[in-house]
Amino acid sequence: MYVEIIDVRAREVLDSRGNPTVEVEVLLEDGSFGSAIVPSGASTGKFEALELRDGDKKRYMGKGVLKAVEHVNEIIAPRVVGLNAFDQVYLDKVLLELDGTENKSKLGANAILGVSMAVARAASESAGVPLYKYLGGANAKILPVPFMNVINGGAHADNSLDIQEFMLVPAGAPSFKEALRYGAEVFHTLKKILKDAGHVTAVGDEGGFAPNLSSNEEAIQVLIEAIKKAGYEPGKDIYIALDCAASEFYNEETGKYNIDGTEKTGDELIEYYSMLIDKYWPVIISIEDPFEQEDWDSYVKFTQKVGGKVQIVGDDLYVTNVKRLEKGIELFASNSILIKLNQIGSVTETLDAIEMAKTAGMTNVISHRSGETEDTFIADLAVATNAGMIKTGSLSRSERIAKYNRLLRIEEELGDAAIYKGLGAFYSIKR
């Protein structure tokens, strides 16, 4: 198919934290329309593509994105108008060449990604198929197991927990719809437990609670209690996943990790995680970013030790970048990768990373950012790529729920063709 792009425009809008971000709208010659809003992270990897901010302290504390908007309207739009909306690979190649830098620092990854996503949306509308079918073809049918971030710590909360996310993983549910119900029921049960214990139950950036618990281990214990009280079996119906975001508690001067009030070497941290896995076996199923983003040695040792039974996810380690992923595959540094569109900055590069990981036998976890919007692109992306897993926040805050509701609609639309793999989605480990 060949349908020309006839108009591209961007504007500054707000994300879920009240910070500016880029929205892009694309119009095609047949009247088809697509729009996209770019998300933004709080704990960002140092190797991520650059999110361009204005730096004008008098406006949005320097976080405005008028430069990125201008780059779309003045530089990108004239170059992509007239291109075929159905040639996503060529479109993204043009965008990368237009920028010409390794980390998209000239035009901004937020400018490039907004256009890339909006064109994909417009093309799917022109083709008369949902976005997941357009990106993934006729075989796009696997609904992802949700990773629900219900207890927040680290950079996502002002509390005593070092580990950034404690997540519910309802891999024992028979369908996505039921998985969502399992998670919601535990979320409400958890709220009551925390409230009864005298904790504040206001929610953080991703919709989870941020209680001042005594230790990271107590957070795991409270989650297990909530799972049981909600009527489910931990390690069978619902599992627990951790996002340690260890770069945030790594001390560059000492080369050690500050966790639970003590300093640990990489080897000592491996023992700490191994203790948690064994003590709560088989409940902990996935650990993300257990080490600092350049501590390849600890990743390799940890994967050798527990990678057969626990999913070890590289986020800051890989930043959805095929060059870093290649190194990880070569070293066998992890058995899974977190996928974030805005870490790399285009749809094609994101799909390339997913494909490379799959070919290497690694799992893919499609992910949101802490600064999100009402955009549901990642829900379609998860189904399009049959990734089998998605991480998109807690069971509150409508920018998180928007993705879950989109997945409910997709599951309903697919009907009997829909597959929820549950534990089978974790194909890089044996359980």
UniProtKB/Swiss-Prot annotation:
EC number: 4.2.1.11
Entry's Gene Ontology BP terms: glycolytic process
Compartment list: Cytoplasm; Secreted; Cell surface
PANTHER family attached to this UniProt entry: ENOLASE
Catalytic function, reaction form: (2R)-2-phosphoglycerate = phosphoenolpyruvate + H2O
Pfam families listed in its UniProt record: Enolase_C (PF00113), Enolase_N (PF03952)
Catalytic residue positions: 206 (proton donor), 340 (proton acceptor)
Identification of the protein by name: Enolase
Record note on cofactor: Binds a second Mg(2+) ion via substrate during catalysis.
Protein family: Belongs to the enolase family.
